[in-house]
Amino acid sequence: MALQGTKRSYEQMETGGERQNATEIRASVGRMVGGIGRFYIQMCTELKLSDYEGRLIQNSITIERMVLSAFDERRNRYLEENPSAGKDPKKTGGPIYKRREGKWVRELILYDKEEIRRIWRQANNGEDATAGLTHLMIWHSNLNDATYQRTRALVRTGMDPRMCSLMQGSTLPRRSGAAGAAVKGIGTMVMELIRMIKRGINDRNFWRGDNGRKTRIAYERMCNILKGKFQTAAQRAMMDQVRESRNPGNAEIEDLIFLARSALILRGSVAHKSCLPACVYGLAVASGYDFEREGYSLVGIDPFRLLQNSQVFSLIRSNENPAHKSQLVWMACHSAAFEDLRVSSFIRGTRVIPRGQLSTRGVQIASNENMETIDSSTLELRSRYWAIRTRSGGNTNQHRASAGQISVQPTFSVQRNLPFERATIMAAFTGNTEGRTSDMRTEIIRMMENAKPEDVSFQGRGVFELSDEKATNPIVPSFDMSNEGSYFFGDNAEEYDN
């Protein structure tokens, strides 16, 4: 991946590395996922899981959550200082599903966090391997993005539920570092900032004293991350205003909501990475694949190829459709919750349908669900083609303003138009153009009005056959221009609740 200026590629962010060349990046990303795989194999041994049980995505998620919880310093400290009934701050665990007499049974397991940390470090050459932990967080975040709608969270912060395409990474923990920041959508950053400003309005001491100084630094850092995602000068200038405000308040909230709306057409750059469940890396390592030697990339053919050759199972409730469950997990694996369904369908080779039409609930099974009626099936995670993941937002004409559709943040670098309802979006921009940001607002609105829904993004970019690992022959799909495809339209998905 070409590095421009001081920008680090996301493989570098992912591995915490300094500037490296492509081969070094591939090796360090390989080392990271290889470590995850080795850890997973060791955990399966500890838990005495059969091969089949080890391929169960629900078991994978429990094991991933255990290691994330074992390394969550802040929460561990909090739990030790505020002991709550029935929670041992030194232990972590969750449901593990095993096959007994032709039925699935749930076993609740409990482990010392210290022990989990030891196994993780041992799998990662004695290091803490924070990059691997972040990678697991991003996989969980991508799964949440595909499974839940954030309508309630959007409404609470004064944003419009139709802006859900800006909400990538909204469930990522704060501690997810640079790699986490890279995959957060515009709406996610705006929401974090608005929450912060609201606290400042309600709590006089929020910006004051020693703590307030730290808060202020965090605020400015978040503003800079958001500014870096915008691609037009006017949007960036508005972010400078928000950042430099002496005492952030309602004016800043207004500006941020304005900017979030503008991002529906003047899209920001948001990174996309294919982060797979730990069991997939475990399967590959167990079969003798050496990730570090072979190298690995999160944004190229590698994850597609890995999924072509992995068999993963999932528990299925009696009223769920296994094909729909597969679609959900496929989207999560490729970070494609906010991609145009026309593009996803083309790459996957089977029709990808909107969330509201899926007969499936989330992947995880609640502790009060009856296991008697639960069966398992194979997840179909293979694809017909592969495509390069993008971080550009797909704006046409030299990364300037372009067409966007309420509800798409492109994942794949594939030529298409990005249809949008200009009337719907522009309706939100009547009113306030006075105040210190008036000229920037006027400029942003002008750019949005000039955007054309039929403009083509990612000119000349196509998908590739799975045999074409060097990406030499792009196949440029032709899409029905009038027919947009957004995943959350007309939707009744469950809400995400912490």
UniProtKB/Swiss-Prot annotation:
GO terms for biological process: symbiont entry into host cell; viral penetration into host nucleus. It comes from the Viruses. It comes from Influenza A virus (strain A/Chicken/Hong Kong/FY150/2001 H5N1 genotype D). Keywords: Capsid protein, Helical capsid protein, Host nucleus, Host-virus interaction, Ribonucleoprotein, RNA-binding, Viral nucleoprotein, Viral penetration into host nucleus, Virion, Virus entry into host cell. InterPro entries: Flu_NP. Its main location: virion. A motif (Bipartite nuclear localization signal) lies at residues 198-216. SUPFAM superfamilies: flu NP-like. Belongs to the influenza viruses nucleoprotein family. This is Nucleoprotein. GO terms for cellular component: helical viral capsid; host cell; host cell nucleus; ribonucleoprotein complex; viral nucleocapsid. GO terms for molecular function: RNA binding; structural molecule activity. A motif (Unconventional nuclear localization signal) lies at residues 1-18. It is found in: Virion; Host nucleus. Residues 1-22 are annotated as: Disordered. HAMAP family: INFV_NCAP. Encapsidates the negative strand viral RNA, protecting it from nucleases. The encapsidated genomic RNA is termed the ribonucleoprotein (RNP) and serves as template for transcription and replication. The RNP needs to be localized in the host nucleus to start an infectious cycle, but is too large to diffuse through the nuclear pore complex. NP comprises at least 2 nuclear localization signals that are responsible for the active RNP import into the nucleus through cellular importin alpha/beta pathway. Homomultimerizes to form the nucleocapsid. May bind host exportin-1/XPO1. Binds to viral genomic RNA. Protein-RNA contacts are mediated by a combination of electrostatic interactions between positively charged residues and the phosphate backbone and planar interactions between aromatic side chains and bases. Late in virus-infected cells, may be cleaved from a 56-kDa protein to a 53-kDa protein by a cellular caspase. This cleavage might be a marker for the onset of apoptosis in infected cells or have a specific function in virus host interaction. It holds the Pfam family Flu_NP.
